[in-house]
């Protein structure tokens, strides 16, 4: 059984993240979405909220394949989380050349520390290439329409966060 790990902050999960998750499910039997927890960062959504939003979004977008997705938290190195959960693949999404430069450096470092873990790059679909969670949060905070950029459950949660 092939297990992939897909790490990020997912604050919030976007249509771009879901595009990468769909691609990862074509490569692996199971995909672990690993939410990085950083003590110095104050996310908009709690870990529990992000787990729920990833779950709801997966059910809505992936259908029966949502059962092949699990969500964990990790602090420290993603390679340690990958080893703990017996992942063989680390999935990374690429939006542009800037992402590629950074991700190649990370893949090189991770490959040195964990040669058994293969990094796989998935290019973003052009329709979601410009989406970032940071921009989504900014647009939502200013009352803009974020529906084109995030799953429906996330749009509702963002609207609730910024109306209170």
Swiss-Prot record:
One of its GO terms (molecular function) is ATP binding. It is an enzyme of class 2 (transferase). InterPro entries: Cyt_trans-like (IPR004821), PPAT (IPR001980), Rossmann-like_a/b/a_fold (IPR014729). Its EC number is 2.7.7.3. The record marks 17 as: Transition state stabilizer. GO terms for biological process: coenzyme A biosynthetic process. It comes from the Bacteria. Pathway: Cofactor biosynthesis; coenzyme A biosynthesis; CoA from (R)-pantothenate: step 4/5. Keywords: ATP-binding, Coenzyme A biosynthesis, Cytoplasm, Magnesium, Nucleotide-binding, Nucleotidyltransferase, Transferase. One of its GO terms (cellular component) is cytoplasm. It is found in: Cytoplasm. Belongs to the bacterial CoaD family. Homohexamer. This is Phosphopantetheine adenylyltransferase.
């Amino acid at each position: 059984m092939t297990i992939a790990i897909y790490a990020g902050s997912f604050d919030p999960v976007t249509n771009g993240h879901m595009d990468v998750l769909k691609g990862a499910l074509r490569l692996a039997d199971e995909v672990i979405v690993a939410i990085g927890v950083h003590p110095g960062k104050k996310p908009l959504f709690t870990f529990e909220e992000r787990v729920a939003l990833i779950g709801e979004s997966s059910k809505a977008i992936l259908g029966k394949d949502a059962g092949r997705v699990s969500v964990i938290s990790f602090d420290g190195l993603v390679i340690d989380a990958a080893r703990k959960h017996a992942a063989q693949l680390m999935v990374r999404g690429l939006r542009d050349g800037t992402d590629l430069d950074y991700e190649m450096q990370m893949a090189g470092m991770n490959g040195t520390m964990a040669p058994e873990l293969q990094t796989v790059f998935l290019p973003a679909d052009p329709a979601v290439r410009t989406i970032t969670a940071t921009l989504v949060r900014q647009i939502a905070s200013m009352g803009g329409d974020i529906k084109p950029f995030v799953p429906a459950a996330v749009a509702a949660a963002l609207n609730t966060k910024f109306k209170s």
